[in-house]
Curated annotation (Swiss-Prot):
Catalysed reactions, as listed in the record: a ribonucleoside 5'-phosphate + H2O = a ribonucleoside + phosphate
Alphabetical list of Gene3D superfamilies matching this protein: Survival protein SurE-like phosphatase/nucleotidase (3.40.1210.10)
Cofactor: a divalent metal cation
Transmembrane segment boundaries: none
Protein's UniProt name: 5'-nucleotidase SurE
Free-text comment on the cofactor: Binds 1 divalent metal cation per subunit.
Pfam families: SurE (PF01975)
Family: Belongs to the SurE nucleotidase family.
One GO molecular-function entry: exopolyphosphatase activity
Origin species: Nitrosomonas eutropha (strain DSM 101675 / C91 / Nm57)
A GO CC term assigned to this protein in UniProt: cytoplasm
Enzyme kind, highest EC tier: hydrolase
Function: Nucleotidase that shows phosphatase activity on nucleoside 5'-monophosphates.
NCBIfam families in alphabetical order: PRK00346.1-3 (NF001489), PRK00346.1-4 (NF001490), surE (TIGR00087)
């Protein structure tokens, strides 16, 4: 079993270290991650300069690019054999609902999926940052299940884990994405030198956290697993737009 690990928090992040440690007991693990925190990078590729690949003292590889760059480079230009699975994370923070559009964690897994590989994005909905081992054990459980019962087709899963000890989890729920309210406005700030700068505002609170959503599962201390797709087409609006053009 060969697993490629990546993330958007950077190769030095505790989440990916926890994941590499626990998965190394059952698989040949290669870590290729960004050299710095690239949270919010989404599915961006670096096209304006070449990428470089380096190996750190802990054996992890790092790239001067985005999470998507890391997976693309590893699968298409670095690894001698294709991985059996791509896993991205463990992200420090939730990737639920609208977060998935912005998330570099989800993007790294998405790139694996686009390259024809089963892929999982995993995030710890963290407050204490003390339960990365919980999320790592959930991933280990999923990988063991995959080894025993492989997917018939490549699949893309988004996993969110409550920030709790493993024994306090209330199970696993297969969910759909919820929705957030719009994000908070940017924060305007004056530097000591008189320059006006802006910080991106916080994500909006949950708008749709109804039963069956990832938000609802996490509110009830359950792990959320959401199968994702790439097709963004609103099929129910195709006829509406056609009629709008005729008018």
């Amino acid at each position: 079993m060969r697993i490629l690990l990546s993330n958007d928090d950077g190769y030095f992040a505790p989440g990916i270290a926890n994941l590499a440690k626990i998965l190394s007991d059952i698989a040949d693990v290669t870590v290729v991650a960004p050299e710095r925190d690239r949270s919010g990078a989404s599915n961006s590729l670096t096209l304006d300069r070449p990428l470089s690949l380096h190996k750190s003292h802990n054996g992890f590889y790092y790239v001067n690019g985005t999470p998507t760059d890391c997976v693309h480079l590893a699968v298409t230009g670095m690894l001698d054999e294709l991985p059996d699975m791509v896993i991205s994370g463990i992200n420090d923070g939730a990737n639920m609902g609208d977060d998935t559009v912005y998330s570099g964690t989800v993007a790294a897994a998405t790139e694996g999926f686009l390259l024809g590989l089963p892929s999982i994005a995993v995030s710890l909905v963290s407050m204490s940052r003390g339960n990365f081992p919980t999320a790592a054990k959930i991933v280990l459980d999923l990988v063991k299940r995959f080894i025993d019962n492989k997917f018939h087709v490549p699949i893309l899963l988004n996993v969110n884990v409550p920030d709790l000890p493993y024994e306090e989890l209330q199970g696993i729920e297969v969910t759909r994405l919820g929705r957030r309210h719009k994000a908070e406005p940017v924060i305007k700030y004056q530097t000591p030198r008189g320059e006006t700068v802006y910080w991106v505002g916080a994500a909006g609170a949950a708008q749709d956290a109804s039963e069956g959503t990832d938000f609802h599962a996490l509110q009830n201390n359950r792990v959320s697993i959401t199968p994702l797709q790439i097709d963004l087409t609103r099929y129910d609006q195709i006829g509406y737009v056609k009629n709008w053009l005729v008018f």
